[in-house]
């Protein structure tokens, strides 16, 4: 029997592995679009010219009259300006199944006054019309930078801080947009300026070069429509992390932004592991958490199989990224969120009011997290040499810090769920045996669950020996008591409400005709 159950336990991970395994068929290339990328030729040496070209690329990327593929090409051109060899940068990181990059050089030609003295060319020919299209008159619908509203002199800024710092300020902001552009477009503008603040304080981004909100929204729209651009940026981060140690200041700043981009869209998955599993509390032995634990284990295997690109599966729109949504392991996620809102006050602002929230598991997570005994890790007691006296005093301090009011945190955010929590239903204090007898509670935990469970499944305790942290049977029974009492009270209130409705239904029916008549003559 044990072998049979172990087969079911590993089914989720083995199923995911078989689905993602290559079938060995022929690889048929898909259709690829051509995207133009512009790089600086050796004749462009003046810093003012370079900054002018950078702002020109940025302006074209925001031009809504252009195709999104063209706008994405201008952002690629801007990002490539950070490297001495843009061609090598694109060859290393720009290999993509969706696009083929065609590179054009921008050279200095003083005779061409209509196009600011520039010409677009390749090794074999010059492109007059492309040059006029790129450097001809262009109406900026909105300012690119907040400094333009204040008539800030970018040339003076260039003289003060130098070209690398000014270019770096622009490119870093493009990277910051990626943090929220794919996974949280609704909060893009707010998230951008929150992340930007650290770079403003350390002087990386000067105030005159801060993007306007419209610029941020425009870049975000291009990123959402051009997956090839996002793939290029992700490959840039992967290359930085795996093969280079001599990074420039700009590249180091990009890596800092990359820390925000990693695991974007995977917050629920990571928080479930952090608060639900790594805390190793006794509630993990509940049988209705077992399927979700197996699912989470298979997701961990999938995540690790992705290698260096695993943190980016959401922004890369990897086909498996939907499996990591918390709706696929709702009970374990709900329990983890209950633990989180108690252990981390910042998590109380996290949106937990979702349609798949399991309210009982959410409350259970809070209950075990507030319990003083469950906060003490027995796995470290022997290693640290904690005495019984010290452990008892620690338990006393934890009990005092918890407040002892037994209040629950309500789910936050999300209009799809409305939950009313009665704070007096369950208390975290220890009740007297006499009180339990008055409520007709039997000591047989199995009978309690059979009599008072309102769920479709019966919650049982099993596999406690699999936990690394030792658990006390009395703690488990106490948790059962608390949940069972709440379920029984809820069922009793529901029955009383149904009885009242049955009694009043006949009277309501008899008054229907009178109410209708009154409405017709304007009485109601």
UniProtKB/Swiss-Prot annotation:
User: GO terms for molecular function, please?
Assistant: RNA binding; structural molecule activity
User: In which compartments does the protein localize?
Assistant: Virion; Host cytoplasm
- Chief site of localization: virion
For bias type Acidic residues, the affected ranges are 505-515
UniProt lists the family membership as follows: Belongs to the paramyxoviruses nucleocapsid family.
How does this protein assemble?
Answer: Homomultimer; forms the nucleocapsid. Binds to the viral genomic RNA. N0 interacts with the phosphoprotein (via N-terminus); this interaction allows P to chaperon N0 to avoid N polymerization before encapsidation. Interacts as N-RNA template with the phosphoprotein (via C-terminus); this interaction positions the polymerase on the template.
What's the protein name? Nucleoprotein
């Amino acid at each position: 029997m044990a072998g049979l159950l172990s087969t079911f336990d590993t089914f989720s991970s083995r199923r995911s592995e078989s689905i993602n395994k290559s079938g060995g068929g022929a690889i048929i290339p898909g259709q690829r679009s051509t995207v133009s990328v512009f790089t600086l030729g050796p004749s462009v040496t003046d810093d003012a010219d370079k900054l002018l070209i950078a702002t020109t690329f940025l302006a074209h990327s925001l031009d809504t009259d252009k195709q999104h593929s063209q706008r994405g090409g201008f952002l690629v051109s801007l990002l490539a300006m950070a490297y001495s060899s843009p061609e090598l940068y694109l060859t290393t990181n720009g290999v993509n199944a969706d696009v083929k990059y065609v590179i054009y050089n921008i050279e200095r030609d003083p005779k061409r006054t209509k196009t600011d003295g520039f010409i677009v060319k390749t090794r074999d020919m010059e492109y007059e019309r492309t040059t006029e299209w790129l450097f001809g008159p262009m109406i900026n619908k909105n300012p690119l930078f907040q400094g333009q509203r204040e008539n800030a002199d970018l040339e003076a800024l260039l003289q003060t801080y130098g070209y690398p710092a000014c270019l770096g300020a622009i490119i870093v902001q493009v990277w910051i947009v990626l943090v929220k552009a794919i996974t949280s477009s609704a909060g893009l503008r707010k998230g951008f300026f929150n992340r930007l603040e650290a770079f403003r304080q350390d002087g990386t981004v000067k105030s005159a070069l801060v993007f306007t909100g419209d610029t941020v929204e425009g870049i975000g729209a291009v990123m959402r429509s051009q997956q090839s651009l996002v793939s290029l940026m992700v490959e840039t981060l992967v290359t930085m992390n795996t093969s280079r140690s001599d990074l420039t200041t700009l590249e180091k700043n990009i890596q800092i932004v990359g820390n925000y981009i990693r695991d974007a869209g995977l917050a629920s998955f990571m928080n479930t592991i952090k608060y639900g599993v790594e805390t190793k509390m006794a509630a993990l032995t509940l049988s209705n958490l077992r399927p979700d634990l197996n699912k989470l284990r298979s997701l961990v295997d999938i995540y690790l199989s992705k290698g260096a690109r695993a943190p980016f599966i959401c922004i890369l729109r990897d086909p498996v990224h939907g499996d990591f949504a918390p709706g696929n392991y709702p009970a374990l996620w709900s329990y983890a969120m209950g633990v989180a809102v108690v252990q981390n006050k910042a998590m109380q602002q996290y949106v937990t009011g979702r349609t798949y929230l399991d309210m009982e598991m959410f409350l259970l997570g809070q209950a075990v997290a507030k319990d003083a005994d469950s906060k003490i890790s027995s796995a470290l007691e022997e290693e640290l040499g904690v005495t019984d006296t010290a452990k008892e005093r620690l338990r006393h301090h934890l009990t005092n810090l918890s407040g002892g009011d037994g209040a629950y945190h309500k789910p936050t955010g999300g209009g799809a769920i409305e939950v009313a929590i009665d704070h007096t239903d369950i208390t975290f204090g220890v009740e007297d045996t006499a009180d339990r007898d008055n409520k007709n509670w039997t000591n047989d935990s199995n009978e309690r669950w059979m009599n008072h469970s309102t769920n479709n499944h019966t919650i049982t305790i099993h596999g406690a020996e699999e936990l690394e942290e030792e658990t006390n049977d009395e703690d488990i029974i106490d948790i059962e008591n608390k949940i069972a009492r709440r379920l029984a009270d809820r069922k009793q209130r529901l029955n009383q409400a149904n009885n009242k409705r049955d009694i009043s239904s006949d009277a309501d029916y008899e008054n229907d005709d009178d109410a209708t008549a009154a409405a017709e003559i304007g009485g109601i």
